Amino acid sequence: MAGARSVGSLPVPNVQALAEICNDPDEHIPERYIRPEASSEEVINNYQGDMAIPIIDLKKLLCPQSSEEECVKLRSACQYWGFFLLINHGVPDEVIANLKRDIVDFFSQPLDTKKEYTQLPNSLEGYGQSFVFSEDQKLDWADMLYLHVHPSDSRDLRFWPTSPASFRQSIDAYSSETKSLALCLFEFMAKAVGAKPESLLDLFEEQPRGLRMAYYPPCRQADKVMGLSPHSDAGGLTLLLEINNVQGLQIKKDGKWFSIDAPNGALIANIGDTLEILSNGKFRSVEHRAVINPNKERISAALFHYPSENMVISPLPEFVKDGKVKYRSISYLDFMKQIFTQQLDGKNRVEVLKLDQ
């Protein structure tokens, strides 16, 4: 987001290049990438019924005959899971296909070509890694390209690849098509808990959005590394697109990790810390992580929706009908500075804002 331009991440080795070396049986994974916790915690892979991640159908939300029932499902998903699969979302297949093609082509290019878009000091935008602030810190097994996509005047085109030639156009089209989708979700989320539909809509409608495209190389010792450290997202809402249908996202619920396998064509939506605070805990952000496949690369694109950097985030009156405020207020700019100057650490940053009940 724009307000985090003054912070950045330390440069680290390119993981895609490192993976090519480490997949040689005679080579060892560098110690900074070894994560004992990657294989020590229970993971649920096959689940159903009440233990299955909710699926929300946008067509049913928009249909007067089924909207009320689907709103109940949406409320439950946001309250108990913090994640849901979104089907019939209305983003054109062609727009998604073009973005997928160009992201795959970008990460397939020679390293020297991708390095033309390397992050600069004190900047989050560009090609590299995020949340690296110490030379002793454990590292994630991933390379990323992060861009500010909205508003358009916040875009720094130095970091927008010109190869593939259609990449900029594909990103712009995807950003435009998902805007109305996100706003629709904000509207129905508020409606689902009896608040005014515009209560969330007004806070996010013309505010910053960022796109993080991530490449997770395969690793023959996948149980020893971590693609993305456990964390919760800082913003309001995240829409995740799986690019090549390789599973790797896991979310934490009731102390256990659940693997998420999205149906082809679905988007994965999740609640961010900001929305948890604004809703006074009626919605909750959830700790999640990315794990590595031993044989296949995984590629994803996460679109983050932020409020204004000038906003003070605190529970909205519409969500505090019982008079019990559960979170301290904090300026969003200060909140983001905390996040982008520390390594990822579960849900710690939102937990410290909770008031004793």
Curated annotation (Swiss-Prot):
PANTHER family: OXOGLUTARATE/IRON-DEPENDENT DIOXYGENASE
Protein name, per record: 2-oxoglutarate-dependent dioxygenase 11
Residues where 2-oxoglutarate binds: R298
Cofactor(s), by name: Fe(2+); L-ascorbate
Keywords tagged on the record: Cytoplasm, Dioxygenase, Iron, Metal-binding, Oxidoreductase, Vitamin C
Enzyme Commission designation: 1.14.11.-
Annotated ranges, domain Fe2OG dioxygenase: 207-307
SUPFAM superfamilies membership: Clavaminate synthase-like
Cited function: Involved in melatonin degradation. Catalyzes the hydroxylation of melatonin to produce 2-hydroxymelatonin.
Stated pH dependence: Optimum pH is 8.0.
Source organism: Oryza sativa subsp. japonica (Rice)
Binding site for Fe cation: H231, D233, H288
A cellular component term, taken from the record's GO annotations: cytoplasm
First-tier enzyme category under EC: oxidoreductase
Reaction catalyzed: melatonin + 2-oxoglutarate + O2 = 2-hydroxymelatonin + succinate + CO2
InterPro entries: DIOX_N, IPNS-like_FE2OG_OXY, IPNS-like_sf, Oxoglu/Fe-dep_dioxygenase_dom, Plant_2OG-oxidoreductases
Expressed in which tissues: Expressed in shoots.
Cofactor binding notes: Binds 1 Fe(2+) ion per subunit.
GO terms of molecular function: dioxygenase activity; L-ascorbic acid binding; metal ion binding
Cell compartment(s), UniProt: Cytoplasm
UniProt temperature dependence: Optimum temperature is 30 degrees Celsius.
Family indicated by similarity: Belongs to the iron/ascorbate-dependent oxidoreductase family.
